[in-house]
Amino acid sequence: SGKVRMMEAYNYQMSLKDDFIGDLWKKIVKNKIENQVKVLEFGNQLSFIKLKNYTLELKPHDSTNIEGSSALLYWKMIFSNSLDYFTRNKDDIRNSSLNYGYAILRSIIANSLTCKGFILHQGIHHKNQQNQFNLADDIIEPFRPFVDLEVYNMFELEGIDEENLTKDIKKRLLSIVD
């Protein structure tokens, strides 16, 4: 029954050992970086080789913060065709589009995890006590580059020139999960 399955998922989640959690987070970060490499390869960015090498340096729990180092390089390169250096500024349409796309993914992941009986506030790496979606925020990481690629396509390749999220941009971002 559904209640038994939920209890099994809960018990499993609560019984995970630190070594397993560390290795799991390492795999999540590795998959995220590998997908970021694919985005940069798609955009013919030569720096994807350096980004790819970061996956070789990963340790359990990402104790050396390779995710942070790779993110600095990734964000520097992904929108390098722009006249200005891209920052995750709240007024930047690319950033608004990324956040919108991530919110779509997060809600789908959170719903799927909840339906399987997992406790969302019990994350693998994310541990914020005020965040009810720590686990979803962990699981989303390897999927973020799919949103990044769509935003890259819209604003860098197609040259969409909007200042605000339009209905068409929102539709495109929603289509990622189709």
Residue ranges of each PLM-predicted region?
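Active-site helix-to-loop segments that bind/position phosphate- or nucleotide-bearing substrates
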Residues: 5-178
